[in-house]
């Protein structure tokens, strides 16, 4: 009986080192130490053990100066009642982090002591505030999105005159 012939036969690889290059040389490790030992040496151990400002800010810690609600947020702003009277809301709600350039500075965490920060430099030229010269009426339908639904009904749906629901 005849043996069935393989239609997709793979030729046997002979002399792999001659045709494909030295396979064993390419599989050699390029590093002296295995990864689990190299991670315990500098610079990798220093990089993995030293937290960045972002990773430290994600850690759980208690700071009594953090605003707990909207009132505390507003009280923590840089507002002086003597010099800041009759300012508008955008000028009142300025926080120290907003107006200072803190790029590359280290964040102070509980238990760490740093020198006192310099006074913030505020310039009215850097604040851009636009006020619409024409007061728009809230009852005006001009510019509103046309829709058969009204918010006054339950679930935002209104009925047609014949009792059916609007559909899109």
From Swiss-Prot:
Task performed by this protein: Microtubule inner protein (MIP) part of the dynein-decorated doublet microtubules (DMTs) in cilia axoneme, which is required for motile cilia beating. May play an important role for the maintenance of myelin-axon integrity. May affect intracellular Ca(2+) homeostasis.
Q: Where is the composition biased (Polar residues)?
A: 38-55
Q: Where in the cell is it found?
A: Cytoplasm, Cytoskeleton, Cilium axoneme; Cytoplasm, Cytoskeleton, Flagellum axoneme; Cytoplasm; Cytoplasm, Cytoskeleton
UniProt entry keywords in alphabetical sequence: Cell projection, Cilium, Cytoplasm, Cytoskeleton, Flagellum
Kindly provide the name given to this protein in its UniProt entry.
Cilia- and flagella-associated protein 276
The organism's taxonomy opens as:
Eukaryota, Metazoa, Chordata, Craniata, Vertebrata
Among Pfam families, the record links this protein to: DUF3695
What is the tissue localization of expression for this protein?
A: Predominantly expressed in nervous system tissues, such as the spinal cord, cerebrum, cerebellum, and sciatic nerve.
